[in-house]
Amino acid sequence: EGHAIGIHTWSHTPGFPMLRSGAMAAGILRCRESLREITGVETDLFRPPYGVTNPMVARAVKRTGSRCVGWSIRSLDTLRQRSREAVARRIRRRLGDGKVILLHDDRPGAERLLAMVLNDLQRGGYRTATVCELFKTEKP
């Protein structure tokens, strides 16, 4: 359906950036293995919690053979006081070729927000792509 699946750690602990690289790598690999067992999908895509990177994260990414994926548009959809319309407007103002939009699927109304964003992209003449397409690679 045009999706690429990646991992985001096993536990999403707020202290993730402060862990030792070995502990980070263990969480990445545990999540990767669970995903493979459940879906059959092998992935090397990884987004660190909160988008925080540092030398320890870089070591864990290298150790696990992962590719770190960030974003170029932070939607701020996790802020409770923001309406879907305000989030969509923020994204619209920042659109451009090759942009990666950060959205969360566990928020109330996430499906409606995604529909709004996709409509805005279509109206703006943009097309969606997976991060694999942006990386120009076939591997999910």
Named regions from a protein language model:
Residues 1-102, 106:
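Metal-dependent polysaccharide deacetylase catalytic core of the NodB/CE4 family, i.e.
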